[in-house]
Regions:
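GNAT-family acyltransferases
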Residues: 1-145, 166
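Alpha-helix N-capping/helix-start residues
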Residues: 38, 63, 153, 182-185
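Short, well-structured alpha-helical patches and their helix-loop capping segments
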Residues: 130, 147-151, 179, 183
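Conserved beta-strand-loop-alpha-helix junction that forms the acyl-donor binding cleft
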Residues: 143-144, 162, 176-187
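Conserved acetyl-CoA-binding loop-helix of GNAT-fold acetyltransferases
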Residues: 148-165, 185-187
C-alpha cells in the first residue's frame, strides 16, 4: 500500500461519538457556563412560563424535555450507555447541557441576580447530537427575569465554537442549527 493511502485512512474522522465526554466550563463576557446537574433549580428562576411562545412546547412538555436533556448529558459525562438508541427519535440522541451562571448584580439592588437559584439563570444545550452527520441543535432556556438581556448572544457563539472545534478539544460538528417557533419574534 502506498504511504499516502495509509496516512489518508488514519486521518479519516470517526463518525462515532465518544462513550464518555468531559463537558468543559466556558466563560463568556457576562456569564459563565458549567456542566448542568439534575439539581439545578430551573423552576426557581421561572424558566417555563411562556414556553409555548419561545420553544413551541407547553410548560409541562418544556420542563420534561429539559429534565431529559440534563439526565442524558449527565449520563454521557459519566460514561453511561443511553437507554434509547437515538435512531428513530432525534430527541433521544446524545446531549450536552450547561447551566448558565451569573455572579453579577445587573439590577443594582446590591444582591447577585440569581441567589435563589444558586446563581443559575438558565441552561444551554447541544441536543440531537448526530455523530454520523456531525450535526446538532442548539437550544437556550432562560429564566423569565433574564430574557432579553443579551445572555444568549454572549454564550451561543462560545458553545458553537466548542461544538465546531475538532476532537478532542470539541465535538467536531459540521453543522449546528437552531429551531425557533414563528411566534418567538425576539429570537
Amino acid at each position: 500500500m502506498p504511504e499516502n493511502a495509509e496516512s489518508s485512512i488514519v486521518s479519516v474522522e470517526s463518525r462515532e461519538l465518544p462513550e464518555r465526554i468531559t463537558i468543559p466550563p466556558i466563560r463568556g463576557e457576562m456569564v459563565h457556563l458549567r456542566p448542568a446537574t439534575v439539581a439545578d433549580r430551573m423552576d426557581a428562576i421561572d424558566a417555563y412560563p411562556g414556553a409555548s411562545g419561545i420553544t413551541g412546547k407547553d410548560r409541562v412538555a418544556e420542563r420534561a424535555a429539559v429534565h431529559a436533556w440534563v439526565r442524558r448529558s449527565v449520563a454521557w459525562a459519566n460514561g453511561e450507555t443511553p437507554t434509547e438508541s437515538g435512531v428513530g427519535d432525534p430527541e433521544s440522541r446524545r446531549t450536552v447541557a450547561w447551566s448558565i451562571i451569573t455572579e453579577s448584580d445587573h439590577d443594582g439592588d446590591g444582591e447577585i441576580d440569581a441567589a435563589a437559584s444558586y446563581n443559575v439563570i438558565g441552561m444551554i444545550f447541544l441536543i440531537d447530537i448526530d455523530g454520523w452527520a456531525r450535526s446538532s441543535r442548539i437550544q437556550v432556556i432562560l429564566g423569565q427575569d433574564f430574557r432579553g438581556r443579551g445572555y444568549s448572544r454572549d454564550i451561543m457563539p462560545r458553545v458553537m465554537t466548542y461544538g465546531f472545534a475538532p476532537e478532542p478539544a470539541g465535538l467536531g460538528m459540521h453543522r449546528i442549527w437552531v429551531a425557533v417557533p414563528e411566534q418567538n419574534t425576539r429570537s
